[in-house]
Swiss-Prot record:
Keywords: ATP synthesis, Cell inner membrane, Cell membrane, CF(1), Hydrogen ion transport, Ion transport, Membrane, Transport. This is ATP synthase subunit delta. Transmembrane segments: none annotated. F-type ATPases have 2 components, F(1) - the catalytic core - and F(0) - the membrane proton channel. F(1) has five subunits: alpha(3), beta(3), gamma(1), delta(1), epsilon(1). CF(0) has four main subunits: a(1), b(1), b'(1) and c(10-14). The alpha and beta chains form an alternating ring which encloses part of the gamma chain. F(1) is attached to F(0) by a central stalk formed by the gamma and epsilon chains, while a peripheral stalk is formed by the delta, b and b' chains. Its main location: membrane. It is found in: Cell inner membrane. One of its GO terms (molecular function) is proton-transporting ATP synthase activity, rotational mechanism. One of its GO terms (cellular component) is proton-transporting ATP synthase complex. The gene is atpH. It comes from the Bacteria. F(1)F(0) ATP synthase produces ATP from ADP in the presence of a proton or sodium gradient. F-type ATPases consist of two structural domains, F(1) containing the extramembraneous catalytic core and F(0) containing the membrane proton channel, linked together by a central stalk and a peripheral stalk. During catalysis, ATP synthesis in the catalytic domain of F(1) is coupled via a rotary mechanism of the central stalk subunits to proton translocation. Belongs to the ATPase delta chain family. It is a peripheral membrane protein.
Amino acid sequence: MSEPASISSGIAARYAAAVFELAKDEGALPALEKDMDALGAAWAESADLRDLATSPVYAREDQQKAIAAIAAKMGLSSLTSNTLALMGSKRRLFVLPQMVADVQNRIATEKGEITAEVTAAAPLSPEQAARLAATLKARAGKDVKLKTTVDESLIGGLVVKLGSSMIDTSVKARLAALQNAMKEVG
């Protein structure tokens, strides 16, 4: 890991640990989870939010006012709003995506959940997602939350990352394996 990334993840981990522990002590983990999901979605969808958080062009006061307005508009809890205000005052909003991911991981661990990253060639139906989650739950022994993405280059099948293991049943991987086998023979 590069040094700047390591520093960023360290900063994010400190904020994540603090907000998680405060929410846990207050019994507000469900609200925090909802806030983190909303912030993660907003970060992914809004180039303006990413620009606000990462651009050095904005003054500290402008960042603070903007993030407070965003938090109010999104209806975030006071704990999350105050955390964002503190991050803005310290010019630490650039670690927001890492902090969100860290908090989500802490909440999942607290709930006995594990997140599986699933990449499919086509969107999964609710029935397929439920069957996959049940199968992965049997394998992992924990509740499984699916984080799905679509990659049409897989042609068909799935790539599932669960913890440190990866299961690749995609047509793309099978074709690559077949191509390698043919190279060895010929």
